[in-house]
From Swiss-Prot:
Residue ranges, compositional bias (Polar residues): 409-426, 436-464
GO terms classed as biological process: positive regulation of transcription by RNA polymerase II
Species name: Homo sapiens (Human)
Alphabetized GO MF terms: ATP binding; cyclin-dependent protein serine/threonine kinase activity; protein kinase activity; protein serine kinase activity; protein serine/threonine kinase activity; RNA polymerase II CTD heptapeptide repeat kinase activity
Subcellular location: Nucleus
Domain Protein kinase: 21-335
Protein name (record): Cyclin-dependent kinase 8
Region Disordered, residue ranges: 361-464
Disease link: Intellectual developmental disorder with hypotonia and behavioral abnormalities: An autosomal dominant neurodevelopmental disorder with onset in infancy. IDDHBA is characterized by hypotonia, global developmental delay, learning disability, and behavioral abnormalities, such as autistic features and attention deficit-hyperactivity disorder. Additional variable features may include non-specific facial dysmorphism, congenital heart defects, ocular anomalies, and poor feeding.
Catalysed conversion reaction: L-seryl-[protein] + ATP = O-phospho-L-seryl-[protein] + ADP + H(+); L-threonyl-[protein] + ATP = O-phospho-L-threonyl-[protein] + ADP + H(+); [DNA-directed RNA polymerase] + ATP = phospho-[DNA-directed RNA polymerase] + ADP + H(+)
Amino acid sequence: MDYDFKVKLSSERERVEDLFEYEGCKVGRGTYGHVYKAKRKDGKDDKDYALKQIEGTGISMSACREIALLRELKHPNVISLQKVFLSHADRKVWLLFDYAEHDLWHIIKFHRASKANKKPVQLPRGMVKSLLYQILDGIHYLHANWVLHRDLKPANILVMGEGPERGRVKIADMGFARLFNSPLKPLADLDPVVVTFWYRAPELLLGARHYTKAIDIWAIGCIFAELLTSEPIFHCRQEDIKTSNPYHHDQLDRIFNVMGFPADKDWEDIKKMPEHSTLMKDFRRNTYTNCSLIKYMEKHKVKPDSKAFHLLQKLLTMDPIKRITSEQAMQDPYFLEDPLPTSDVFAGCQIPYPKREFLTEEEPDDKGDKKNQQQQQGNNHTNGTGHPGNQDSSHTQGPPLKKVRVVPPTTTSGGLIMTSDYQRSNPHAAYPNPGPSTSQPQSSMGYSATSQQPPQYSHQTHRY
């Protein structure tokens, strides 16, 4: 390359340190790199941004794939990549996103902590409905554009704080997303293990090779149940964190303890699953005779005749062929009864959730989880965010993660497929404060976060 051209190119290249002020504003840290809350130096706007510095030098193929997807996706409920900076001097890669102040993992933890402190603060019904509708809207857009997310969980669902997009849901972390219109080989061959265990569909646990967008719908059902109860519905101890074998006995056992063992008539193709013989060897149908989703949700005061429960049943249908689609779910009667979903999930009320705190350069954002991770090496397999959660001694660990990855905050940019018309209901009552004993950890909008929740739910190492 011509020397003069290289000099000219270098002089014209925008440098992140010249454009943004971010020193001392770290909000996330992990094996993926670092995330900073940043502002423009030129004062052209007063917005907050999230700057993610990718760990290491250069750019990996997985990062290239994620960036390529993010540059194409434009929808109000999907994260939007603003810009990519390449530092020529140290070969660092920086990604710029809009800053999201909250995420579902911290929101749910806030309510779970209030319950643990005997000062229960329920997630308002209207907020749950608005959150679910916007998640479905974003996933419908992805699926309509032939994209599987493959790692949906509360930590990857961001919620914008004060500002023009107040209360807007952003689906984050496209690190495991894949196009599924014409794969060269079965997706299971490309990535044998996807989706954090607690949110993993039964067909994945049974080794399905040609899995579909139904895996995202199951994960949304898990998130919906967690919003309704403040407890992860399929939490269990995790083992074999490094295994590439999708079959997981304990996770299947947890699902059957909640849902019951699937009858042949309910899932006819279960016999075609690669791990069906292992399933029949390890499990006895009569062990789960008294288990059902109705009984589980009744314990959490969700009535089986409610529209919320009926939709949950459709999302958590064992047979992926019979599982509802995102488009069908958005048309469910649940969204037609009061309170109606709103574009601001907080419905104009005061936001009760704490803002993210800054980390020191030496302070890992997952300091509260580091010890847990060492103890859980076989217990947590999470794609970068491990949710331990638990109501009893069997769930003292968090959901396993796969590779630690970061979840960028996001912005809105208009939808290619459909932008919902959210109907606004009457404002919900303001949330009571559960008190100082429920202090929240640093949230890292899907980037990464410190988990300081009660020991039984020292949930997760967040990421971006």
